[in-house]
Amino acid sequence: MSDKKPSLSYKDAGVDIDAGNALVERIKGVTKRTHRPEVMGNIGGFGALCEIPAGYKQPVLVSGTDGVGTKLRLAIDLKRHRGVGIDLVAMCVNDLIVQGAEPLFFLDYYATGKLDVDVAADVVAGIGDGCEQSGCALIGGETAEMPGMYEGGDYDLAGFCTGVVEKSEIIDGTKVADGDALIALASSGPHSNGYSLIRKIIEVSGADLESHLQGKTLADHLLEPTRIYVKPVLELIKHVPVHALSHITGGGFWENIPRVLPKGSKAVIDGNSWDWPVIFDWLKENGNISMKEMYRTFNCGVGMVIAVPNEQADKAIQILTDAGEDAWKIGRIANAAEGEEQVDILADETH
């Protein structure tokens, strides 16, 4: 007579449905604090419903998706999870605002080897913080516990956001003209890009993440959440004709600014118009990184670049300053010769 086979459960395979349900209960308060009047129903359904806000004549939906990249490795190792929730939202909504869109709703995907409810709830609380900062509703998401796919409690994140813009008010760079002023918005640090290089610099330099730079630990500088520009930029758009916006993310200045410039134009950047935040000087020195590599990898203290008519530059800077941003004139638009690069950074090698 053969031995009776054990009765297996999903939990035996490493998936805890009860933990997933506990997480849903924990995050219901987060969705409530991000609620918008257009949202219909509550979380937990098969799909989330959202009306288009009233007042749009020809509404165009704008969507985007992004992640946080290897900044997550630092956050996991240092057990500091809430900030990367803000990062996740920021990377999505800042891309939407580039086209003039008001973010409406956000969904997240959280994948892990073993679900730690406290860690996941901390991340989602940060997502709620980011949604509040951008006026965006957190309306749903997916938590995937996948043993064998991720090591232990390691996790990955993806965000999905949808916004709306009036068709006649889409910002697509077609109005960019010779002589336009370029306005910079300060970043809060590296944001969510360049962290594979940052982690390599930490490795080769043997840096102590608890060492201090200008009153903050290195860890604090590196895990500072990505700045969200939605509300200040929406306010600017109401009062100034914005010709283009560029979110300075992966690829830095060299890759992102040309994405919003018409053929035959270039951005002339005065690299001496601002002082880099100390973390970028630290990265350059400890990684022995060239200036060109810095500008093509990191934001170097600039999270967003905005093109406006030159005569509107002072007004634009004042509006952004009043909204709490550190804004300044960083350069101008000029004509580009055939085959010429679309970004020209004039700066001292040592900065």
UniProtKB/Swiss-Prot annotation:
Q: Which CDD domains match?
A: PurM (cd02196)
Q: What is its main location?
A: cytoplasm
**GO cellular component terms given for this protein:** cytosol
Q: Which InterPro entries match?
A: PurM-like_C_dom (IPR010918), PurM-like_C_sf (IPR036676), PurM-like_N (IPR016188), PurM-like_N_sf (IPR036921), PurM_cligase (IPR004733)
Kindly report, in one word, the top-level EC class recorded for this enzyme.
ligase
Per the record, the pathway is: Purine metabolism; IMP biosynthesis via de novo pathway; 5-amino-1-(5-phospho-D-ribosyl)imidazole from N(2)-formyl-N(1)-(5-phospho-D-ribosyl)glycinamide: step 2/2
Matching HAMAP family: AIRS
Family listed: Belongs to the AIR synthase family.
The protein's matches in PANTHER family, at most eight in alphabetical order, are given as: TRIFUNCTIONAL PURINE BIOSYNTHETIC PROTEIN ADENOSINE-3 (PTHR10520:SF12), TRIFUNCTIONAL PURINE BIOSYNTHETIC PROTEIN ADENOSINE-3-RELATED (PTHR10520)
What is the official name of this protein in its record? Phosphoribosylformylglycinamidine cyclo-ligase
What species is given as this protein's source? Idiomarina loihiensis (strain ATCC BAA-735 / DSM 15497 / L2-TR)
